[in-house]
A protein has these predicted regions:
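Single-stranded nucleic acid-binding surfaces, predominantly the OB-fold ssDNA-binding core
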Residues: 2-108
Length: 108
């Protein structure tokens, strides 16, 4: 376990995780009881908290055989295209490490 990964706490119906990043201290809850599976990926509802102050609810941990990422809340625009409420630049690779920490919490 790397020094940035904290111990996870398993509760009745959710799993908590923490990750200390360069920009923020991340924490969150995963809800494996509400997990769904499609042909290509596993979707686990989650909430993500930044620095213990801002909580983003309605996120999803998306897992395929070779990739894990966090899907943020979205809305459908006038042209029926899905748009995210959050802009995450591709250069911000820390969010990938947060997704990996969340995935590891599910496995523990």
């Amino acid at each position: 376990m790397s020094r940035k990964d904290k111990e996870t706490k398993k509760k009745d119906n959710f799993v908590e995780f923490e990750y200390d990043g360069k920009e923020f201290k991340y924490s969150g809850r995963l809800y494996p009881d509400s997990q769904t599976e499609t042909k290509k990926c596993t979707i686990t509802p989650m909430s993500l908290t930044l620095n213990g102050v801002i909580t983003i609810k309605g996120c999803k941990l998306m897992q395929t055989d070779n990739k894990t990422w966090i899907n943020f809340p979205q809305y459908q625009d006038k042209e029926k295209k899905w748009q995210s409420y959050f802009f995450i630049p591709k250069e911000f690779e820390e969010i990938v490490k947060v997704a990996e920490a969340a995935e590891k919490a599910m496995d523990d």
